Amino acid sequence: MTPHRLLPPLLLLLALLLAASPGGALARCPGCGQGVQAGCPGGCVEEEDGGSPAEGCAEAEGCLRREGQECGVYTPNCAPGLQCHPPKDDEAPLRALLLGRGRCLPARAPAVAEENPKESKPQAGTARPQDVNRRDQQRNPGTSTTPSQPNSAGVQDTEMGPCRRHLDSVLQQLQTEVYRGAQTLYVPNCDHRGFYRKRQCRSSQGQRRGPCWCVDRMGKSLPGSPDGNGSSSCPTGSSG
């Protein structure tokens, strides 16, 4: 076989090797359409460590955010096992999530589950509150056996604004589900005094933004809202 006849097969083999090399075109994740990939930062690529090709993609809602990437209420969801956390020590964590300034970090267990065992075990040499009250009852029969505890929760409830109380109840019910974005959620948007900000929005679902509406500082909807797509501005007379 002459060298001229060998040239076309060699060129074809070279082209196949270049296409399969790491420097070639990025492989697309199954389930991410071409239109969806255009909105995914960095493209939709397969993992190099042999993981599931679809790990970085949602079925029909665009690419999932990887660990360390920015996230928020209006961004695609974090990958499984990750949660969108606001910046540490941020004074307005929910506002940071609304602005997309969170980070996808490993999911953490609720802190309450870790604190309860420590609180239930008194240190050696210390008397439990019920034992102290029992001794006081024996010395002073006219006193009450109910432990006297400061009503810190009640004081906080009276000092909190209506939006902050609403927010606390939502967080208690949803706990970590608030940041996962598995479904459309409503998390109250409060100002630093605990009242409602003028613009309230539901969370996004995939790359589709949730609806927004306008309220006064007590959370009452104002005329002309919601608009259904979150594009209108709210009047300046309400809290925000």
UniProtKB/Swiss-Prot annotation:
O-linked glycans consist of hexose (probably Gal), N-acetylhexosamine (probably GalNAc) and sialic acid residues. O-glycosylated with core 1 or possibly core 8 glycans. O-glycosylated on one site only in the region AA 143-168 in cerebrospinal fluid. One of its GO terms (biological process) is regulation of insulin-like growth factor receptor signaling pathway. Disulfide bonds join C29-C32, C40-C44, C57-C63, C71-C84, C78-C104, C163-C190, C201-C212, C214-C234. Residues 160-234 form the Thyroglobulin type-1 domain. PROSITE patterns: IGFBP_N_2, THYROGLOBULIN_1_1, THYROGLOBULIN_1_2. InterPro entries: Growth_fac_rcpt_cys_sf, IGFBP-6, IGFBP-like, IGFBP_1-6_chordata, Thyroglobulin_1, Thyroglobulin_1_sf. It is found in: Secreted. Residues 109-160, 217-240 are annotated as: Disordered. SUPFAM superfamilies: Growth factor receptor domain, Thyroglobulin type-1 domain. Keywords: Disulfide bond, Glycoprotein, Growth factor binding, Secreted, Signal. It holds the Pfam family Thyroglobulin_1. One of its GO terms (cellular component) is extracellular space. Glycans are attached at T126, S144, T145, T146, S152. Residues 28-107 form the IGFBP N-terminal domain. Residues 139-155, 228-240 have a biased composition (Polar residues). GO terms for molecular function: fibronectin binding; identical protein binding; insulin-like growth factor I binding; insulin-like growth factor II binding; signaling receptor binding. The keyword Membrane does not apply. Residues 1-27 form the signal peptide. It comes from the Eukaryota. IGF-binding proteins prolong the half-life of the IGFs and have been shown to either inhibit or stimulate the growth promoting effects of the IGFs on cell culture. They alter the interaction of IGFs with their cell surface receptors. Activates the MAPK signaling pathway and induces cell migration. Interacts (via C-terminal domain) with PHB2. This is Insulin-like growth factor-binding protein 6. It comes from Homo sapiens (Human). The gene is IGFBP6.
